[in-house]
């Protein structure tokens, strides 16, 4: 035992000497000639790489801070924490604590109706908490701790973390990464430009050298190359299969000569053939190709094409007017033009079909005869842009204009058409060029609106054009984003709700399933049970029936109830046990908006059983997003009433002008939904034969008792939501997903 002691002492002396030689004395300073130099980009990047842990600690340092939670409008809270010292916490962990080893958390409030609470994580009041829990986890195997103890330790480690703050920290980190990517991309672009310049210089240098050194040699070797190519071609085309392949690429005259030669060549074996004959023929053909290869092929090709067009003009004429060709492209073009003009969707593709016929016929007549140039040019211009008035008069003044239309006699007495109605200007000149029976057969498909026809007075044509353009809804850019332009308009009064149609059986007794009315696809979103934090997505109804989910979203905050909706790519729900409503962006996967309902009558102690409806219920109809929740009636005797409010889908704000206090009372109805601005409520959720016993119209501020039959097929309906895109009610009935068709009175 005495031998290792001198070694230890020697090692200590060596370490002390090395440390003393490497560390400068404390009283010395840097020499005056050493100046501070600005760091370069490499130094900055190296410092960033070395200080990664420091950056993370700076960003995550406020996790251990104490948080104050306040409730009330004029409430101000402040938390004062006196934590333990590190020596004190070590004494507590060792079991030798003193009287002065304690921490305090004080709450300072200001305001009349103020409630404050201080949330202090263990790491904020006890600096040794993290080391203590880490030591316990390391000793878990030796002490044989139970799983519950480990879970408690992990919960304590995550206690006090705020996911919104975590999102902000992640955003900061992403910002730093974006800056790094920008710098790297700039450097890469500079390097790529430099490399391109170097490559161009090398290419130009090589081209110069190649031209100087190899031009004479190339010219001298050209005859040798040509002779070698001719010999190779003669040897290759000596076989019959190669000769056929060569003849297919020759012109018509060469094919005729080759066919005559081929009739005699198969009778001779390949070994008996003389090499001089195909060699002479090959040289002769190569000479013809070198002289005019392109001219021969081009002339032959264009002559054949033009002759076919001249012979088939009548067939194309019939095909175009029969609607069998050239229609799809014009229909697509006409639909795009209708969207640009913002007209209503009352025109049919038949209008475009006749437009295509007129345009084609006008071009054919212009090519066939030059006696009517004004008519052809006017008809063609009426398809591309609004035609002049004089051209329209010339087109419509033909004798057949008033005799071909036997049915719509109230439309055709006018001989002048507004220049702004492009499609109708192209339709009406049609009888002057097409036989009457063809147009009369297709006439019922053409919708002719009375608003689009002008009068007999020339000075009123401008007014008629204005009326024609105003026949459809002229929408402003702000109104184009309205939901009614995507999913349609209201169908007026609700008349009947059909019986339920069971689509699937999935999940627990309570839950909700929904579709996004503004989405182009048919994705289905499911929340299983009335409490949780996982939203499941299915690609379509068939995948939902098969149980094949395509995506899942782990929400940062749990939801409660079944009154959620998916609207315009976001999930709207009520945060569990709070007055908060949340908008969660499904594409970006983050909380896009957050709001608090200050007047909601929220039950602090919510029982863990289904109440028959959700306290906070979202709804979607043709007008947008709605919110239904209980509140205290300030105008009455502080009784609870059900409030219906139009919700801003962007920031979750409400307006007093679009908020109504209904006659519903909590726990006196089953489920509710909104259709065309009217709130409907079902009287029971657990009776098979229920009724829609209440309706509140936001347009007239009136309430009625409609007494419409509503069937709860499985006698336990926990969700009813209206989808304005499908005109269906989506319901969750005792683990069954059912739909109801909505029938309107008008």
From Swiss-Prot:
It is found in: Secreted. Residues 1-20 form the signal peptide. Glycans are attached at residues 187, 213, 691. One of its GO terms (molecular function) is identical protein binding. Its main location: secreted. One of its GO terms (biological process) is extracellular matrix organization. Keywords: Coiled coil, Disulfide bond, Glycoprotein, Secreted, Signal. Transmembrane segments: none annotated. Residues 489-746 form the Olfactomedin-like domain. Residues 43-68, 179-213 form a coiled coil. One of its GO terms (cellular component) is extracellular matrix. Disulfide bonds join 490-676. It comes from the Eukaryota. Homodimer. Binds to heparin and chondroitin sulfate E. This is Olfactomedin-like protein 2B. It comes from Mus musculus (Mouse). The lineage of its organism: Eukaryota, Metazoa, Chordata, Craniata, Vertebrata.
